[in-house]
């Protein structure tokens, strides 16, 4: 079993996991998965910044020009295309050492009795659908 989720959906998945009321080992597994996803999210944030910097106009020293806390982007359309592709890339957390954690968290989601609504309902569905591989 593995968790395979798009970069753009990692933050929502973390929020859903954080709202689950769990005890004991299930709580430990949830926290472990949150840590793994948080590490991936940090990578995504850094890579997004790097991508934006690569499209930013540069000053005489080769540093990106920032105006009103935003990069001065030279090729906006190309950046948007790359960002869309980047956000749709999937992060994979393989079973391996995390097999028990992934199965436990999926089971916790199935047993969850929270009535999700709005964006949280979409985030819950996206997270649940990100689990792949069944009971291998």
Q: Where are the predicted features?
A:
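A composition-driven surface/loop motif
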Residues: 1-136
